[in-house]
């Protein structure tokens, strides 16, 4: 089998919005952009991956089409480890983070999709299997910056069966209102989005001590200040989580060696795909750190995260951005039911996208 074509596909999925309009980077967030990676082979097996996009989707699409594809077309898609190694070594001078690594991540997910399809297995079984049929999802609320909106969204999420809540807020009055809304039985996590110095974060963590947060996520800027995070972790009453902005194994190793976090959060669309994500799980086990992936995605990135987590020895929480769509190319597979994700049972990632919907959403 040979790879014959690699295509980046950008889609825009509109959000279903109510009175509570979320914000991102200071502007209303009305939709989600996703960079899909479609890998075709000469035997008719097609794999689907996802590369981190956010505001830099143009650069990521260019990296896929002009940097990655020419180096990989014609290769055997089953040689995943060798393809990964060749790309990382051959492209080191483009940087160890950013669009090139995001492109490699999307390719890697697609190659694992192909491998599992050829084996006739859902990916998690190819990775070691699981005794579980579901994994708990946590409702990862978007940023609202408004106390009432946040409290209303928490009530809605709990009503849908979620048992774990995460905020993207950093104002104490909002966090405290959310803690009251959750009550003592619902774990509450807070993603702060890197707003503070280490000393400021220590002060805030102590101010929040009575809320008994499950974790405080990315409280410090810059996010790669590992020694600063370690100092915060030693002083904070709440556990510290970080890692979504790390894009290579070595940097994750440095994070854990520094003793910076209790929860490590690799992102499969940034770290190098399934191949590198599995290494981070092993690294976490070696350091006694819990790995809980960053997965605010709605396609192959989310599905790949579910499969890797399903194959882990212990139960892993799955992040699900708490928002709704009128339609999505990946249908019901990306929607939790009663607060749980069903582990996909079809070969590969378990769900190929609806190409008609892709055609309507394509940018």
What are these regions (language model features)?
Residues 1-46, 65, 81, 155, ...:
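Non-catalytic terminal accessory/regulatory regions of metabolic enzymes
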Residues 2-4, 8-17, 29-34, 275, ...:
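Flexible C-terminal active-site loop/helix
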Residues 94, 118-143, 178-179, 183-185, ...:
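N-terminal small/glycine-rich loop or linker at the start of catalytic domains
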Residues 167, 172-297, 336:
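Catalytic core of soluble alpha/beta enzymes
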Residues 74, 121, 238, 289, ...:
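Short glycine/serine/threonine/alanine-rich loop segments
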Residues 135-149, 192-197, 241:
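Active-site mouth loops of central-metabolism enzymes
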Residues 6, 40-118:
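Metal- or metallocofactor-binding catalytic centers and their adjacent structured scaffolds
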Residues 3, 44, 68, 107, ...:
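Conserved, mostly hydrophobic/aromatic
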């Amino acid at each position: 089998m040979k790879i014959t074509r690699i295509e980046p596909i950008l889609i825009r999925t509109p959000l279903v919005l109510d009175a509570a309009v979320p914000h991102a980077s200071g502007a209303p967030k009305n939709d989600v952009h996703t960079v899909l990676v479609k890998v075709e082979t000469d035997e008719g097996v097609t794999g689907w991956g996802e590369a981190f996009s956010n505001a830099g989707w143009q650069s990521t699409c260019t990296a896929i089409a002009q940097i990655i594809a020419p180096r990989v077309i014609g290769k055997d898609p089953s040689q995943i480890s060798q393809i990964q190694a060749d790309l990382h070594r051959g492209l080191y001078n483009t940087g160890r983070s950013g669009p090139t690594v995001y492109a490699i991540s999307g390719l890697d997910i697609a190659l694992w999709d192909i491998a599992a399809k050829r084996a006739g297995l859902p990916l998690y079984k190819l990775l070691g299997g699981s005794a579980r049929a579901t994994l708990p999802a946590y409702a990862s609320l978007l940023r609202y910056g408004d106390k009432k909106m946040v409290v209303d969204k928490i009530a809605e999420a709990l009503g849908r069966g979620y048992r774990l809540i995460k905020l993207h807020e950093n104002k104490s009055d909002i966090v405290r209102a959310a803690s009251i809304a959750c009550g003592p039985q619902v774990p509450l996590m807070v993603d702060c989005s890197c707003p503070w110095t280490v000393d400021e974060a220590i002060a805030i963590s102590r101010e929040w001590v009575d809320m008994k947060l499950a974790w405080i996520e990315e409280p410090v800027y810059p996010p790669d200040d590992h020694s600063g995070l370690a100092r915060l972790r030693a002083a904070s009453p709440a556990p510290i989580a970080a890692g979504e902005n790390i894009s290579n194994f070595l940097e994750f190793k440095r994070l854990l060696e520094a003793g910076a976090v209790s929860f490590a959060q690799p992102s499969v669309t940034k770290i190098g795909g399934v191949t590198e994500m599995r290494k981070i799980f092993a690294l976490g086990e070696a350091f006694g750190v819990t790995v809980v992936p960053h997965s605010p995605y709605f396609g192959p990135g989310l599905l790949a995260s579910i499969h890797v987590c399903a194959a882990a020895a212990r139960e892993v929480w799955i992040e699900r951005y708490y928002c709704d769509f009128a339609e999505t190319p990946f249908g019901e597979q990306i929607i939790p039911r009663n607060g749980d994700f069903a582990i996909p049972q079809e070969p590969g990632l378990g769900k190929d996208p609806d190409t008609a919907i892709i055609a309507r959403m394509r940018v």
